[in-house]
A protein has these predicted regions:
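The feature captures the beta-strand-to-loop junction immediately N-terminal to the Walker
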Residues: 35-37
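Helix-to-loop junction immediately C-terminal to a conserved catalytic motif
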Residues: 50
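Conserved ABC transporter NBD signature motif
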Residues: 58-70, 119-124, 128-131
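ABC ATPase NBD coupling module
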Residues: 67-84, 108-111, 115-117, 127, ...
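Short coil-to-helix segment of the ABC ATPase nucleotide-binding domain corresponding to the Q-loop/switch region
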Residues: 96-105, 110, 114-117, 121
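ABC ATPase nucleotide-binding domains
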Residues: 100-104, 108, 227-356
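Internal alpha/beta loop-helix hairpins
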Residues: 308, 313, 318-426
């Protein structure tokens, strides 16, 4: 999965800066949380990376591809960035079933794709299933109700999940009625021979055209996979829907409507729909905010599992520091559009960059005590606090206050000089929402 790189990205409306000169490197296969108070610019940052918001200036790269560059005039549309976006309200179509919600976006994709021999692929799957007729019959028989009647929806679901096949292949496999045969072994053997002969005929046809099929049943000619601009077939769409439904465990809800699902189930459907096109990056904008406390905790574990299983890069917006601390490999803490700290959760917690970070992260909040004093030669500090009380502070690590003050003053002077130089540009706009 790709790395995401933001370079001097700014978004402003008039004199109001939603995001101010943000530079970030998000490593591949990372779980990044954008954390901060309401209105700090985290959702705007997410939307700019996804292509739903146009930055005022800067550059954004996803992998090796520049998707936005203000100077070069590049702005790749959102639907061409190969990213998935999970909205806060899930955005499920109420008039569509779960299956239709997940498959809807797949039907609109048209791009250069490998040519796949789907018939050969389905035949190979059925031949493999028929190699163990006892297991196949057992799967079907397990789907009988108390009256002995087969639940066909359950039969198809078991066949789909057990053999990783589409609904169309599952129906064809069931229609062989192997479970009704007197001699199941002989019936399976005969059907397997028929399917093998058919598969051999297809492979021979490819050979005549000087083609072959690879392990994914893609057509290979001259050592290269044959591609063409096309849409996904019904078989491919169904396989994709079934794949993501297994990941988020919603296979049994395919025929239900969103109104018939709980909040957690609706979220799983939204996640499945986002994962179906196999996006390079997955963006989530406070997806747990509508759930109750217990369900939020459960879904955090689900998101961690998904991150490990999919290997995707996750970028997650939240103002809940507990979510950020438990989910993230790195926390990007923003305030008033300005990056405050970008490090691992424990580093942000134990070594805050400034007073804002120290105050924002942690529950209960940290206590700030104003103190005046001097530093001794051994590094300890004699201080006066709380209306004249004397105290001695011994730092855990070596602390040179004089050096710290000198560096602070230098950084402030450098920042003031950079700002002055920036404001000399005729295109520069003074920030109305001043930093604290």
């Amino acid at each position: 999965m790709p790395e995401i790189k933001l370079t001097h990205v700014t978004k402003r409306w008039g004199k109001f800066y939603a995001v101010d000169d943000l530079s970030l490197d998000m490593e591949d296969n990372s779980f990044i949380t954008l954390l901060g108070p309401s209105g700090c610019g985290k959702t705007t940052t997410l939307r700019m990376i996804a292509g739903l918001e146009t930055p005022t200036s800067g550059q954004i790269k996803i992998g090796d591809r520049v998707v936005f560059d203000s100077e070069a005039g590049i702005n790749v549309p959102a639907n061409k960035r190969k990213v998935g976006f999970l909205f806060q309200n899930y955005a499920l179509w109420p008039n569509m079933t779960v299956y239709q919600n997940i498959s809807f976006g797949l039907g609109n994709i048209k791009e250069e794709l490998p040519v796949i021999d789907e018939e050969a692929k389905a035949l190979k799957s059925m031949i493999k299933a028929l190699e163990n007729p006892g297991e196949l019959v057992k799967l079907i028989e397990e789907c009988r109700d108390k009256k002995g009647k087969l639940d066909l929806d359950m039969v198809y679901l078991k066949l789909i999940d057990n053999y990783t096949i589409s609904i169309y292949t599952a129906k064809e496999l069931y229609n062989y009625k192997l479970h009704e045969a007197a001699d199941k072994e002989s019936a399976a053997k005969q059907k397997k021979q028929e399917l093998t002969a058919k598969l051999d005929s297809i492979l021979a046809g490819h050979k005549e055209k000087r083609e072959e099929l690879n392990e994914k049943f893609e057509v290979v000619s001259g050592g290269k996979v044959v591609t063409r601009v096309r849409k996904y077939s019904k078989e491919e769409i169904d396989l994709a829907v079934r794949r993501v439904s297994r990941i988020v465990k919603i296979g049994m809800f395919m025929n239900r409507y969103p109104a018939e699902l709980s909040g957690g189930q609706q979220q799983r459907v939204a996640i499945a729909r986002t994962l179906a096109p196999e996006p390079q990056v997955l963006f989530m904008d406070e997806p747990l905010s509508n759930l109750d406390a217990k369900l939020r905790l459960e879904m955090r574990y689900e998101l961690q599992r998904l991150h490990v299983e999919t290997g995707s890069t996750f970028v997650y917006v939240t103002h809940d520091q507990m979510e950020a601390m438990t989910l993230a490999t790195k926390i990007c803490l923003i305030n008033n559009g300005v990056l405050q700290q970008y490090e691992a959760p424990l580093t942000v917690y134990s070594r805050p960059n400034n007073l804002f970070v120290a105050d924002f992260v942690g529950n209960p909040s940290i206590n700030f005590i104003e103190a005046k004093g001097v530093q001794n030669e051994n590094g300890s500090l004699d201080v006066t606090i709380l209306d004249g009380r004397k105290a001695k502070f011994v730092p855990k690590e070596h602390l040179d206050l004089q050096r710290w003050f000198a560096e602070r003053d230098k950084n402030e002077a450098d920042e003031a000089a950079r700002h002055k130089e920036k404001m000399q540009d005729k295109k520069a706009v003074e920030k109305s929402n001043k930093d604290e």
